[in-house]
């Protein structure tokens, strides 16, 4: 039985009912409907911290989903799980893949920047300031892209960019 049919939370049940109604009335292929069901089940598993189950659902959703925009969100969520698991290289790969399909995902740019900033901090701890600066410069580039897409957001990143003189704001 799909996970979305066994959850006990009222909000989750309501979402599932509405999603099922929409799936019946919106003209989509059976593959897209299955992809959405896997995506929805992946989101539910992810919200409960069941990352292995979420990944299984997301991988199946990516296999079935044909729309690049919808695939971008599936790939983004896979990136989130890899980030949570400390698998930063894999996370970056999935954020890149999401952005290839949808370049208007500021949260993907932000998460990539956070990973690069973290790696810069790690390089400092290892005594490698040259590598640290390269990571920080990369973080700055990603944050600039996130900020360009949503200028009112990422205030902490904007402050960091100002303090480190990596970007001047008007």
Curated annotation (Swiss-Prot):
It is a peripheral membrane protein. InterPro entries: PSI_Ycf3_assembly, TPR-like_helical_dom_sf, TPR_rpt, Ycf3/AcsC/BcsC/TPR_MFPF. Essential for the assembly of the photosystem I (PSI) complex. May act as a chaperone-like factor to guide the assembly of the PSI subunits. Keywords: Chloroplast, Membrane, Photosynthesis, Plastid, Repeat, Thylakoid, TPR repeat. It is found in: Plastid, Chloroplast thylakoid membrane. GO terms for biological process: photosynthesis. This is Photosystem I assembly protein Ycf3. GO terms for cellular component: chloroplast thylakoid membrane. Its main location: plastid. TPR repeats lie at residues 35-68, 72-105, 120-153. The gene is ycf3. PROSITE patterns: TPR (PS50005), TPR_REGION (PS50293). Pfam families: TPR_1. Belongs to the Ycf3 family.
